[in-house]
Amino acid sequence: MSQSREGFESDQATLKVYDTKTSTVFSVTQGHDTSLEEIAWSSDEKGLFFTTHRPGFLVLGYISLKGKDLEYLVEDRSVIGLTVGPNNDVFFEASRIDSLPEIYRYEKTSRELSQISHVNKKQQEKWVFGQLEKIKIGEGDRQTHGFVVLPPGYNPYRQYSLLVLLHGGPRSAWTNQWHHRWNPQVFAAQGYVVALPNPKGSIGYGQEFSDAVRLNWGKASMGGTLAFTKHLQRRSDIRDDKTCAAGASFGGYLAHFINTRSQLFQCFISHAGIFNLDLFWSTTDRQWFPEWEFGGVPWLNKEVYEDLSPSSAIEGFRAPTLLLHGQKDFRVDVSQSIAAFTTLRRRGIPSRLVYFPDEGHWITRPQNLGLWYEEVHTWLAKYLR
């Protein structure tokens, strides 16, 4: 895998092959506007299987060494963990927002997909899942694609509170995939309509769309997020006076950024969210990351850092905010949430800080994850019910 822009972790990843006989390197995916994630040689060594982000899914694909068109094999669920067996059979884990993870086999010769594990069968049959809707608003450069998860037992004649989840990254995306963190079904089960927008900066929509957030954090992603939210608030089944936004890492940063500039939301949740970009540069374990995103070091790009930092717009803070953070977070230091909490409290805005002394950037311990969800549910219930 090869990237052309030094210091940019989310640059387009091109697949290249080194020919040991001719000592030459050739590109297999040149000309395709996509980045490959996992790759695995086919059993006949004539091509490679891969996963890549497409709108709303992490799909399974195949490309021959001749460099022809990418062939997408499984596009109706999200795929991870490729293993190739004999006869070009591919084994992997696949899931959807309403379908728990299982192991599948894709037979390339017959083009048949079969489920070979049933470890989550009892849970799948027992649990009631909310219905999933695909949403796309706008066109071209202004489009925002995403999902909506309805509460179980949804009644179109009722009105529901709205929870907008903000993904991290910023170069990431909400996909139709099951995950234990920020699981939309868990929130939908509380009686909320859950929105999963993929605004500018999201992956799976072309490199230009992903690149749009550089030197424009917050502003680029906020536009699509607000448009997506307003689109849903105009629906008859949504209460426009009961809306909360929540996210982690960049999503937590975006929550702070929107809170200083919009009155669309009644509450926010920020997990490991960036509050002060100068402080972020000086405390993160990856200084090259903000230097790429904001065009260099803070003292030489003061205007960019200040313009995009939520801490520069403290007067705009208005909505109650729940903050959560782990002490062992080396990506976004815990001082970010402490600073945001202190500022919110000093401004007289209802806020709460939940501190995990034994967690890092993500909450990974089951007991802590249970507490995390409990705190989040309690906060949402206070402002959305």
What are these regions (language model features)?
Residues 6, 111, 119-241, 248-249, ...:
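Cap/lid segment of the alpha/beta-hydrolase catalytic domain
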Residues 44-46, 87-88:
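Short coil/turn segments that connect the beta-strands within blades of beta-propeller domains
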Residues 19-23, 63-68, 107-111:
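Short loop/turn segments that connect beta-strands within beta-propeller blades
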Residues 1-16, 27-36, 51-61, 75-77, ...:
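A flexible loop/linker signature enriched in serine peptidases of the S9 family
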Residues 196-385:
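Active-site-proximal cap/loop segments of hydrolase catalytic domains
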